[in-house]
Amino acid sequence: MSLVSVIVPTYNRRETIQAAIASVQRQTFPDWELIVVDDGSTDGTADMIAGSDPRLVLMHQQNQGVNGARNVGMLRARGRYIAFLDSDDEWLPHHLELSMAFFRAFPGEDFLSGEFCEDWGPAGSVHFLHSALTEWYPPLAKRAGSSLLQLPAGVSDPFRRVFASVEPIGDWGRDIVARTPYGDARLYRGRVFEHMRFGFLFALQPTVLTRRAREAVGLFDRRYRIGADYSYLAKLCRRFSANFLALPMAIKYEYARDGTRLNEGHLSTGPTRFEFERDLLHQFEELFAAERSPDREIIALRRERQLVVGRAALRQGNRVEALHYLGRARKGRAAPSAAALWWLVRIAPSAAAAHRLYTRSQRAWVLGKKLLRGLTLWCRIARTAWSRLCCTLTLKRGT
């Protein structure tokens, strides 16, 4: 029996599935089984990989969505540990070896995750959690009136906004990290469920959990076609202490190798963006009892999420849903922006017209900010030049 069961759901990923499987085969830790659940593909995905590796278990089912496919794979898993990979993503070679070294060193822990890189093709790439804790979540916390992400006194490490402790990688993993392109990493630990109110802190791709954790948390919620990993990871964090390695363990690709955008059916962007954001809102409401919470912070974060859902609906030209969610959002701290968008949708002759107006207003806003930054910069340059000129003239008069 293999030590690690790797779960890979797939649907019409003929262009990426081989690269995903190859990234598992390149792991420096060899004791794994790979369970690929074909969720009713029609493009020959299953035929392409059948029989390609004796450690590969290929399962078939009628299309039930990614969460149904993950659940089938988890129920089939035989390993002591369960790891996840999407069929359009890849693991870095050290992922399983470093994860297993961690669990040997800390046998009482039940789940581990790491940083993952989002590759946006021509737009570049980002390290998700680092970007979230430096650029995205702190402004959101400020708007919600939350102090939960404040750094401890004298600390500048953004990961400490969430994790209570940090330590260097010990003897258990130092040599493994030294063989990676990154050369150094730290281990962060703590109870972080309450911090999940701001959004994802982890991704499934670099996450490994024990069978004990799987049995405690259960399966993925099939009510949500996209994004159920948010509530699953939050439940893990509510039940267990979180462990996080601050070095990339996996890469999430939004583009195929030929530069074309991947099929959007399983992504949180493009045509499925509204569904993704709506489902995240509903999961947030369930996890934090937002509909009846007396907590002002939870209420404010709920309004922020409603605004995001309303914008996503507007981008897709869905007038009814845009009015619904923007109408709910305009009751909170997001009110000025939500109210303006709500009135825009109300007065526009059609959803398409509202979408065009919204898109143009967004472009104008971005352009205005760029112009303002440029004007501010030139004003600073002019003030500096004027100060130097005045100083020079004063010195000349003195002589």
Q: Residue spans of the language-model regions?
A:
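A conserved hydrophobic helix/loop-capping motif in glycosyltransferases and polysaccharide synthases
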Residues: 4-16, 20, 27, 37
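Acidic helix N-cap motif at the loop->helix transition within catalytic regions
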Residues: 15-18, 43-51, 90, 94
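A conserved acidic beta->alpha catalytic loop
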Residues: 23, 30, 38-47, 86
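Acidic donor-binding/catalytic loop of UDP-sugar-dependent glycosyltransferases
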Residues: 44, 89-102, 120-121
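Glycine-rich, basic loop-to-helix element that forms the pyrophosphate-binding segment
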Residues: 61-77, 98
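Short aromatic/hydrophobic "clamp" motif used to bind/position activated sugar donors
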Residues: 82
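Conserved nucleotide-sugar donor-binding catalytic segment
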Residues: 114, 140-273
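Catalytic core of nucleotide-sugar-dependent glycosyltransferases
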Residues: 135-144, 248-256, 261-293, 314-332
